[in-house]
Amino acid sequence: MADFNQILTPGDVDGGIINVVNEIPAGSNHKIEWNRKLAAFQLDRVEPAIFAKPTNYGFIPQTLDEDGDELDVLLVTEQPLATGVFLEARVIGVMKFVDDGEVDDKIVCVPADDRNNGNAYKTLSDLPQQLIKQIEFHFNHYKDLKKAGTTKVESWGDAEEAKKVIKESIERWNKQA
């Protein structure tokens, strides 16, 4: 398998369209991660079923978040996407998140061309409020059985704030490359 970080760029960040590689399908409790050294997807662990992901979960190639991993993405779609699918996505916001004291922000996006529902989602406020609540609950509690209180959704930001986070992550990637 080719390394997504070698074949895909982050995308047109200023234009709000990014490349996303999906790791975990929405509804899955399998914590699948991209292993950069092996250029392969790896099952890290199986979470309790109650903590299945409320959205697809992936990353933006050629980025590094403050935790040392590629910048995470929450990708909202009607149906789960398979592990390894990559696509262009439209940035609609950012979830500011802390995991065990480390910044671990999540970019929120939808497919760039989703003629079913996604084209209607231009901002976070366009998403169903119940989905926002589910995302917050999930990320505030998914580690509770292991070590309660180690994760916290701190705030939500708009697409412009998300683009800043992406650009900072690209800078970190370029410094280590």
Swiss-Prot record:
Q: Which residues of the sequence carry a binding annotation for Mg(2+) 1?
A: 67, 72, 104
Annotated GO MF terms: inorganic diphosphate phosphatase activity; magnesium ion binding
**Name this protein carries in UniProt:** Inorganic pyrophosphatase
Share an example GO biological-process annotation for this protein.
Answer: phosphate-containing compound metabolic process
Task: State the needed cofactors, names only.
Answer: Mg(2+)
The record's CDD domains line, in alphabetical order, gives:
pyrophosphatase
Chief location category: cytoplasm
Record note on quaternary structure: Homohexamer.
**Bridged cysteine pairs (disulfide):** none
Q: Where is it found, in Gene Ontology cellular component terms?
A: cytosol
SUPFAM superfamilies in alphabetical order: Inorganic pyrophosphatase
The record lists Mg(2+) 2 as bound by: 72
EC number(s) for this protein?
A: 3.6.1.1
Entry-linked Pfam families: Pyrophosphatase (PF00719)
The UniProt entry's sequence similarity note says: Belongs to the PPase family.
Catalytic reaction annotation: diphosphate + H2O = 2 phosphate + H(+)
Residues annotated as binding substrate: 31, 45, 57, 142
Q: Which UniProt keywords apply?
A: Cytoplasm, Hydrolase, Magnesium, Metal-binding
As for what it does, the entry says:
Catalyzes the hydrolysis of inorganic pyrophosphate (PPi) forming two phosphate ions.
- Annotated localization: Cytoplasm
